[in-house]
Amino acid sequence: MKKSIAITDEIYQKVIEHIHVGMSEYEISALVQYYSIASGAQQMSFDTIVATGERTALPHGRPTSRKVKAHEPIMIDFGIQYQNYQSDMTRMCFIGEPDPKIKEIYDVVLKAQLAGLGAIKAGAKGKDVDKAARDVIEAAGYGEYFNHGLGHGLGIGEDGEGPTLNSKSETVLQEHMMMSCEPGVYVPGVGGVRIEDDVVIIDGVGVPLNKTTKDYII
């Protein structure tokens, strides 16, 4: 699993080195696919999500011919299957400084993700981990725009393994469980932000396995 995630980190770094103003979402998605297969992936974990500008308000926006502009958000959410282990990561990036409103949303989502990561531990319930992140977003006034659960299980197979992190999950987290932690805020007409890491519980606490930076200017 660690190898799958490490390769995912490497793929993202290669992709963002090529992103430029005027590049289409289709082209970015194609780069993700190319570097994934070239790096040894069996296949993608799911259809790659690439959205730019106001389209980032779509939580699962599939790529289009829309072209990248400076200062606007670029959302890339992808994962690979490597030796049957599935990875899943989301990062935001910008060419130049982001619009102040999107930067505000980014900072809220990052704070929420850190709260969620801190709540992942053996013995915690899935709903309590979700609440830790959701409380941050609600306190910032964006609660209505976080419209999915905090995370899902990861591992072997199409649906992965492990717990679901949402407001109704009674699952008790246990040692070695793998899960994603991916809060998001999606404001129609403005844009959206999601930040996602893959996490494993080791010695009772959640350990993020992704090494990709969350510094977003490329």
Regions picked out by a protein language model, each given a short descriptive name:
Residues K2-I218:
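Active-site neighborhoods and metal-handling regions in enzymes and metal-associated proteins
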